[in-house]
Amino acid sequence: MPGRLIYLMGPSGSGKDSLIEAARRPLARLGCDVVRRVITRSAESVGEEAHGVSADEFERLERQGAFALCWRANGLAYGIPVQIDEWLASGRHVLINGSRAHLDQARQRYPELLAILLTVDIDVLRQRLMNRGRESAAQIEARLKRSALFSTEGGPVLGESVFFLDNSSELSVTLERFLKLLRSQGISAIQGRT
């Protein structure tokens, strides 16, 4: 039986990377691999476990078919390695840090994906973005404006079958809800794993 793609989305600053890192061990027990994205900026500045490449290298990889999914947002290019297809085919579940604007693209390739939108209170989001110090005030406001397009209403941008997960409070609470959601959607432990 094939594995399932878990497509985690959320605005920059919503805590996706923190949630993914906190969930890494429990996800392994659920038979779920966490994928490293390929991004056109250095890994040190990403704030996530990613593979940083130049724009030229990204384009070369894209032409060679190295990505199962890829998109561009906020002046950067993002790619999900094509190896996830092998993992899914072998029955492994796969978690990726996806893009809200490219959910339809992902659904076309993976119709059974589990879409989860990590949300956060706008004031909390603003403070998180300011605290990390990667963007100017104008860039932060642009990100907040973009985030508003993907409200908890879902609507035509996100389509149907999106689960919303609030990360405005403690990470431990969000982690517990996240794992409960995965189990409720059939992401269960593999026999023999502890």
PLM regions with names:
Residues 94-99, 109-132, 147:
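Conserved phosphate-donor/acceptor-positioning beta-strand/loop module used by diverse small-molecule
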Residues 9-11:
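P-loop (Walker A) phosphate-binding loop of NTP-binding proteins
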Residues 14:
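ATP-binding Walker
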Residues 2-6, 91:
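Pre-Walker A (Motif I) flank of P-loop NTPase domains
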Residues 37-94, 100:
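ATP-dependent small-molecule kinase phosphotransfer cores
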Residues 17:
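Walker A/P-loop
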Residues 134-184, 190-194:
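Small-molecule kinase domains that catalyze NTP-dependent phosphoryl transfer to phosphate-bearing small molecules
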Residues 25-34:
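Post-Walker A helix-loop "phosphate-sensing" segment adjacent to the P-loop in P-loop NTPases
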